[in-house]
Amino acid sequence: MERYRDGDAVAFERLYARHKGPLYRYLLRQCHPREAAADVFQEVWSRVIASRDRYEVRAAFKTFLYRIAHHCVADHYRLRDRKRENRMDSVDDHEEALAVQGYEQPEARVSQAQLDDAVRLALSELPEEQRNAFLLFEEGGLGLKEIAEVTGVPAETVKSRLRFALAKLRRALADDLGMRVTLQPARMET
């Protein structure tokens, strides 16, 4: 980011190429409806570009990027909530109700699509702080200290949120899929 700030356009291309996949996966899991992830993704990179001249090295670029993403997701939900308040018959609410009905799968064997749906539903049922910590960890690839910097809480709080999120996800997936689920992140060190 420092090289980009100093005028090296190729440096930005490298940053974008390195971080676009994990960032987009993180946003796909955070944003509802899923189509909103593309808009939030654009907003994140727009803010990175806009902050070019003001950028100061305080942490790793990845931490800087996910802090922006964290704020953009919060802005997305604030805007969505305002729109919902303005219209009582929300199309989104109707779509959510239909989507939840689609998660009831009677088959004993679980297809990848069913597993994806079950994971999406289980993630949506987590408290926001736990979901955010889990997605920053799993999709963003951030460590405990980086998540603590992004979210503004101590690393031990992040660790606690991750443990609660994992326990709830295990239970929810076991209930939904009728099978034992092993979710064990390998890098839960501080």
List where the protein language model places each region.
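N-terminal module of bacterial RNA polymerase sigma factors
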Residues: 1-22, 107, 124, 146, ...
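C-terminal edge and immediately downstream basic/flexible tail or linker adjoining helix-turn-helix-like DNA-binding
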Residues: 3, 85, 89, 118-121, ...
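Short, charged helix-capping/linker segments at alpha-helix termini
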Residues: 5-14, 24-43, 155, 178-179
